[in-house]
């Protein structure tokens, strides 16, 4: 076992940073050193922001987004299209779509995808709440913005069947060639999806 090179408080900081996705032990040490070097301008404000976040962050009971208010900022935004619900796997997907500016609708965060391998069943997700929302007056379209994985496709089919009685339009994101992509570098599955979802030019 490697010997500790600093006091327990610094070692704890390194260990906690190392739990972050994409940060291994070496990256965690580098991040900790940067925080320590910039104690006044970075470490103290970050610690304060994290304390406030831990106290105030809540999950929106309507859509599943995280915010400091319930309902969340997006659900309270009256400029959004109330006829469309965009279904995403996780909050990170919601944030990605918001950054793109491509859609100005309401969202529904499932909290994951169905997975027989991982034992994730419909009751582990917010599918029942989605069905309730799909039945609300004025809702006309459900956009399935789920990842193009086997579990994502399984979840999309399950959701589609669950909301079928409402007679809503159900669409999903197009799959295929990314903007700026070269065909030679794409895998066969992506090329097949691109051919099948081709559109008029």
From Swiss-Prot:
Keywords: DNA damage, DNA recombination, DNA repair, Metal-binding, Zinc, Zinc-finger. Signal peptide: none annotated. It comes from the Bacteria. A zinc finger (C4-type) spans 60-75. InterPro entries: DNA_Rcmb_RecR, Rcmb_RecR, Rcmb_RecR_Znf, TOPRIM_dom, TOPRIM_RecR. GO terms for biological process: DNA recombination; DNA repair. Residues 83-178 form the Toprim domain. GO terms for molecular function: DNA binding; zinc ion binding. The keyword Zinc applies. CDD domains: TOPRIM_recR. HAMAP family: RecR. May play a role in DNA repair. It seems to be involved in an RecBC-independent recombinational process of DNA repair. It may act with RecF and RecO. Belongs to the RecR family. This is Recombination protein RecR. It comes from Methylorubrum extorquens (strain PA1) (Methylobacterium extorquens). The lineage of its organism: Bacteria, Pseudomonadati, Pseudomonadota, Alphaproteobacteria, Hyphomicrobiales.
